[in-house]
């Protein structure tokens, strides 16, 4: 089965970017809280 590299990269970015954004917001909020 041929894997579309561009589709895989696009999917990975689509998942990783919001996850990283939420993680950064969480860390900033946690550091401000304490």
From Swiss-Prot:
Transmembrane portions of the chain: 5-25
Entry superkingdom: Eukaryota
Keywords for this protein: Chloroplast, Membrane, Photosynthesis, Photosystem II, Plastid, Reaction center, Thylakoid, Transmembrane, Transmembrane helix
One BP annotation, GO: photosynthesis, light reaction
Record's bilayer topology term: Single-pass membrane protein
Family: Belongs to the PsbM family.
NCBIfam families: PS_II_psbM (TIGR03038)
Name the record gives this protein: Photosystem II reaction center protein M
Organism: Physcomitrium patens (Spreading-leaved earth moss)
Species lineage: Eukaryota, Viridiplantae, Streptophyta, Embryophyta, Bryophyta
């Amino acid at each position: 089965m041929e894997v579309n590299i561009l589709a895989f990269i696009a999917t990975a970015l689509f998942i990783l970017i919001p996850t990283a954004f939420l993680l950064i917001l969480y860390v900033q909020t946690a550091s401000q809280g304490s």
